[in-house]
A protein has these predicted regions:
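Broad phosphate/nucleotide-binding scaffolds in NTP-utilizing and phosphate-metabolizing enzymes
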Residues: 1-168, 172-174, 194-199, 205-213, ...
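Catalytic-loop of the protein kinase fold
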Residues: 179-189
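Short amphipathic alpha-helical recognition elements used for nucleic-acid or partner binding
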Residues: 218-221
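Conserved phosphoryl-transfer catalytic core
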Residues: 226-231
Length: 275
């Protein structure tokens, strides 16, 4: 785990990126972090009667990403049996997404846009974000009171409440995928909270993945019974999605086609009948 930023370093970060010290910006500010974020830490503040969460990025994160990935790349190539020069695009994708997560100005923009686009979904809440209190390394939003999703699921025994949360998650991601054609690509339980009324609260939109048509169309055609039940068509879609590649061996083609066929048949079963 990364050691928390000291109070003097927190003050220095504010002065550098917002031009003022925290006590000049907020009515109150906790000098010590209350929570950890993926690449930073979260402080509590108040301003104009509102309780706020202030996320501050650890220094040097953005600068270390490329060098760290260069060290990991040889091991990942062997571990995941990545072949050919085309594997480079996967590393570029990972690097670009990690760098995007270090840009809190981008996260601010994406968070506001996602909250606005999905505000109609029942039982789903988002914090309000404050551009005037944010920068490329500092992000200020409403403090959201609630249990983390993992804590809720470990303690909850009420199926009605669980179904309500599950339905909200489903509605949220289906709307993103099929209407926005982009998804919140960091959906671990720490990025979801449950309030006292069993509303789902979604936070941390630093990683958003746009879904291009050339992926969307063949991916969801895989769920069509006509595709699943047609071996030639099914294999064609796997090639379109680069699950199968031209340089795969006959053994690899048989192996991966079989795995994905079994998974897709099982996964799509609830959509092909009444249960």
């Amino acid at each position: 785990s990364v050691p928390p930023l000291s109070a003097p370093l927190v003050r220095k970060t504010f002065k550098k990126y917002l031009g003022k010290f925290p006590e000049e910006i907020y009515d109150s500010f906790t000098p010590d972090a209350l929570n950890a974020a993926s690449i930073g830490q979260v402080h509590c503040a108040t301003k104009d009667g509102k309780k706020l969460a202030v996320k501050i990025q650890y220094p040097g994160v953005a600068n270390s990403i490329s060098s760290d990935l260069a060290l990991v790349k040889p091991f990942a190539t062997r571990m995941f049996n990545l072949k050919g020069k085309d594997s480079e695009k996967y590393f570029i994708e990972v690097e670009n997404k990690l760098l995007e997560e270090t840009d809190y100005t981008l996260e601010l923009k994406q968070s506001i846009a996602m909250a606005e686009a999905c505000k109609h979904i029942p039982n789903l809440r988002f914090p309000i974000y404050y551009p005037e209190l944010s920068s490329e390394r500092i992000l200020t939003m409403d403090w959201m009171e609630g249990q983390h999703l993992s804590e809720f699921t470990s303690k909850n025994t009420d199926s009605t409440k669980g179904n309500k949360i599950g339905q909200t998650l489903w509605d949220f991601y289906m709307y993103q995928m099929h209407h926005l054609r982009q998804v919140h690509a960091d959906p671990h339980p720490g990025n979801f909270l449950i309030d006292e009324n069993e509303n789902l609260m979604a936070i941390d939109f630093g990683c958003i993945k746009k879904v291009p048509n050339e992926f969307y169309v063949p991916y969801f055609e895989l769920a069509d019974p006509k595709t699943i039940n047609n071996p030639i068509l099914f294999e064609e879609k796997l090639y379109q999605l680069e699950i199968l590649r031209a340089d795969d061996t006959p053994e690899e083609i048989v192996y991966f086609t079989g795995i994905f066929h079994r998974l897709l048949r099982l996964f799509t079963q609830p959509f092909h009948g009444d249960y």
